[in-house]
């Protein structure tokens, strides 16, 4: 999750129309696949409750998001080049509908402004992610990811292991991530418990 404000009013207007035509789903257990790679270009998924992770086909973790969230809103216009999986990280409720149906509903209800606002927000989130990761050294990537994690609420941080999340998001080797985390803990820069992030006192700009 990132600090950019989610366009909630636009989401609610989209949800009001899309939900009438969606097929509802509910996942009780963690790590259940909501959207398979084969479905990622053909369906729109709307998450109403819960937390989900978005994983690219090459196993890179794009991010973890809390409801409400829409995935695949633009696929009726342009298919994604890569395939993705949506994975439940908690109990999760939502619905799905085909990308072509989503496009027809947006057209019928003149929801182009709302769809545009949502897509722009998602693009800004991905741009911020790229800024944190691309062209930066391993420590800078780890530091940026820790700063992202500390913005999560306490319940979410208690679910997500720091080392695995950083490794999957950045592809920095586990040994390097473990070394940096150990040094930060030793220097009292961060506090962790059972592999979960508790707090950040401050993070040095260089390692």
UniProtKB/Swiss-Prot annotation:
Q: Which CDD domains match?
A: CAP_ED (cd00038)
What are the recorded GO MF terms, alphabetically? DNA-binding transcription factor activity
This protein's GO cellular component annotations are: cytosol
**What does a knockout show?**
Deletion mutants display increased resistance to oxidative stress, increased catalase activity and increased survival in macrophage cells. Deletion results in the altered expression of 82 and 56 genes in log and stationary phase, respectively.
Q: Tell me the superkingdom of the source.
A: Bacteria
Q: Which InterPro entries is this protein grouped with?
A: cNMP-bd_dom, cNMP-bd_dom_sf, HTH_46, IprA, RmlC-like_jellyroll
Record's keyword terms, sorted: Stress response
Pfam families tied to this protein: HTH_46
Q: Which Gene Ontology BP terms does the record give?
A: response to oxidative stress
Q: Which residues bind DNA?
A: 163-182
The family line of this record is:
Belongs to the IprA family.
Q: What is known of its domains?
A: Deletion of the N- or the C-terminal 10 amino acids abolishes activity, while a region that includes amino acids 56 to 80 is dispensable for activity. Contains a predicted HTH motif, which may bind DNA.
Q: What does this protein do?
A: Involved in oxidative stress resistance.
Q: What NCBIfam families does UniProt report for this protein, alphabetically?
A: PRK11832.1
Descriptive protein name: Inhibitor of hydrogen peroxide resistance
- Species name for this entry? Salmonella typhimurium (strain LT2 / SGSC1412 / ATCC 700720)
């Amino acid at each position: 999750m990132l600090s950019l404000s989610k366009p909630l009013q636009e989401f609610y207007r989209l949800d009001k129309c899309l939900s009438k035509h969606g097929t509802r789903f509910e996942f009780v257990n963690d790590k259940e696949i909501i959207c398979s790679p084969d479905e990622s270009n053909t369906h729109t998924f709307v998450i109403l409750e819960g937390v989900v992770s978005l994983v690219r086909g090459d196993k890179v973790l794009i991010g973890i998001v809390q409801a409400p969230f829409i995935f695949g809103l633009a696929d009726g216009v342009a298919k994604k080049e890569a395939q993705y999986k949506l994975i439940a990280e908690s109990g999760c409720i939502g619905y799905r509908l085909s990308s072509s149906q989503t496009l027809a509903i947006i057209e019928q209800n003149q929801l182009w402004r709302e769809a545009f606002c949502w897509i722009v927000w998602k693009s800004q989130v991905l741009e911020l992610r790229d800024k944190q990761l691309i062209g930066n050294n391993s420590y800078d990537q780890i530091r940026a990811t820790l700063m992202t994690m500390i913005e999560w609420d306490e319940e979410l941080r208690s679910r997500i292991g720091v080392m695995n999340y950083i490794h999957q998001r950045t592809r920095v080797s586990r040994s390097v991530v473990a070394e940096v985390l150990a040094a930060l803990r030793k220097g009292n820069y961060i506090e962790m418990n059972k592999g979960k992030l508790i707090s950040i006192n401050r993070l040095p700009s260089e390692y």
